[in-house]
Amino acid sequence: MTIWAIVPVKPLRRGKSRLAGTLSEDERTHLNQLLLEHTLKTLTDLKEIEQILVVSRDPAALALAREHGARTVREAGSPKLNTALKRATVVAQLYATRGVLVLPADLPLITREDIRALVKRAKKPPVVVIAPDRREEGTNALLICPAGLIEYDFGPGSFQRHCDRAQQAGARLEVVNLPSLGLDLDLPEDLEMVLKLEGLQVEEPFVAEETA
């Protein structure tokens, strides 16, 4: 089964605005770059992932993605996340991919074993595999097979909406709860938790150690 990983990326200098009270703009930019690099390194050379597709309107993010061997789609204007993901999925479908894995670039603890766990649950389509955030409100990873089976509905409360869409489509629903997939960096308390786990300081933007 061929799976493409789609990684949506906000402009590196604008992402993580809710951390503005904790990190400076330069520190947030550096953090966003490190998180993207970690995500790309985690996905690279995984036999379960045929191709990585990064979608962004930030030339710097797209250039970094290409340095890691990823394909890129540059957004025109300022489309909503769900619209950008739909366009990226169409690109993946042109290459006859069977499934797509949407993976935001703000999961500092994600490992290759996490990716394998998601793909393992995607056997025998039609299937939708969802990894919720630690509050079980948002969607931190979404694997859809076949690609295009359900509409994207990211945003506050997206976990339940994606579950509902999977059931409405008659797909098997698989929910994967893993601590490393549940923690995304959105709020100051998320950053504090990661720094505490890794024994780092705020001035040292975190990237999880690569796991083979």
Which residue ranges define each predicted feature?
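Short, glycine-/small-residue-rich phosphate/pyrophosphate-handling segment
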Residues: 124, 144-166
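A short, N-terminal amphipathic alpha-helix
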Residues: 32-48
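Acidic donor-binding segment of Leloir-type glycosyltransferases
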Residues: 47-72
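N-terminal nucleotide-binding beta1-loop-alpha1 segment
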Residues: 1-19
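Conserved alpha/beta core of the MobA/IspD/sugar-nucleotide pyrophosphorylase nucleotidyltransferase superfamily
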Residues: 164-212
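Short aromatic-hydrophobic micro-motifs that form the base-stacking/packing surface
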Residues: 101-103
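Short phosphate-binding loop-to-helix
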Residues: 64-99, 179
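Conserved donor-nucleotide/metal-binding helix-loop-beta segment in metal-dependent transferases, i.e.
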Residues: 110-136
